[in-house]
Amino acid sequence: MNMGSLGLYITFLGLLAAIYQLRQNFLQQRTIFEDSISKEYRDIIQRIPYRALIGEEILLSEASAVQNEVYNYMDLCNEQIYLRMSNRVSKKTWNNWQEGMKTNFELKVFNDTLNEVFEKLPSNFIELQSVKALNFSTDPKKCKIYDNLLKWILN
């Protein structure tokens, strides 16, 4: 092997190492970003009474505050869906978030608020409406057509 070939080989190995480092940096930054979104979820859920989180009736005095937090959660869900559509979160993270959406929206106060908002604001939360229509079992990154279809149906 001559010096020119050796130099090319070393350059190639250096390029591979740089690509690997860039990929690792990207994955680390994505994880930090995903964790920040998960913190938003925890902040919202902390403000919802325990009774609501286990599916029990809430006190009338709590209803308005709980509905506000569920609305905030719906907004967060819509953002999470958009982030997956834009490939800003991993499939693993998306699947975890989607499973959480399904579980939370099965709870009475979440489901009641969701249905009320969808009824009163049919053109809002289009992404969330689409994912719910598919029973929280989809990957928005793969298929954006349902979003356009739902917009067409609602108009």
Predicted regions located by residue number:
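An amphipathic alpha-helical interaction surface
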Residues: E62-N155
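Membrane-proximal alpha-helical anchors
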Residues: M1-Q67
